[in-house]
Every structure is written in structure tokens, then in C-alpha cells.
Amino acid sequence: MKWITREHVKVDRVACPWLIKNFVDKDAEFVFVAPDKVMDEAKRLDAIPYDVKNVELGHHGKECSFEAILKKYKLIADPALVLLGKIVNGADTDNSLYRQSEGPGLQAVAEGFRHLGYKDDHALNAAEWIVYDALYAYCKQMVRQGKLDGMFAK
């Protein structure tokens, strides 16, 4: 299946493809286009839009697109993914929903990746996914230790 979103990816538009590829659609293909072209291209390519306004897999209230995907594809049964969703939310939004302490750190790392000069959004995603692999491992460890809000919960 094809999945489409806005170009010049930031936190949620890197986290969502990682989540989709690992837990929803192992054969996923990702398309990144100008914001004003997403819906037209989604229709033309028969692609699923995500992290754009007014779509099912977008922001709703203070929840980010990663969380919409968790809910839609019933991934909320995995408490480590739920914790990762809170961290992504904290990095992608004003962090007022969960006040997840790890969120600002992820935001800083993601911003750093944007300044490393990757040739396009595909290359940036490929490079940055290791961060999400590591964060997921961290979240699994926090769950095993009973720290469902992460190590640095307030």
C-alpha cells in the first residue's frame, strides 16, 4: 500500500512511517509531496494520507498522528508503543497532553537530523529510524520495570 504525507518531514512524519512499516504494513511505500498536493496525490495514487489536516490518521485534539495510527490499527494493546506514542506526542506538539519528559529530547534529535543534509525525506527517514528502534527498546524496558510513563515521569 502507498502512504502519503507532506514533504520536509519532522517528528511525526518520521515516527509514523516507522510505525507503519514495523507494525501495520511491512510492504508500505511512502510518498512525500507539497502540503497542498497531498489529497490530490492521495486520490491519484490510491494512497492513505497521514499527518495532514482533516484526515483520519492526523492530529485530533492534542493527540498526534502516531497516536491516531496506534488506535486505528489496534496497536494500543502494546504498552511500549503507547509509551512511545506519548514521547512522540511530546516531541511533535506543545507537550501539554502528557508532559512526557523524553519528548523534548526526541524533538532535539529529530531537528538535528534535519540539519545533517540528507538528500530527501526518504533518506532522512532511513537514517532516523534507528532512533525509533532504540526508543521502542527503551519503552519496552520501561514497561518491564513498571514505569509506564517512562524513566523521567514527573
Positions of predicted regions on the chain:
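Histidine (H) residue identity feature
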Residues: 8, 59-60, 115, 122
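A charged, amphipathic interaction segment
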Residues: 71-154
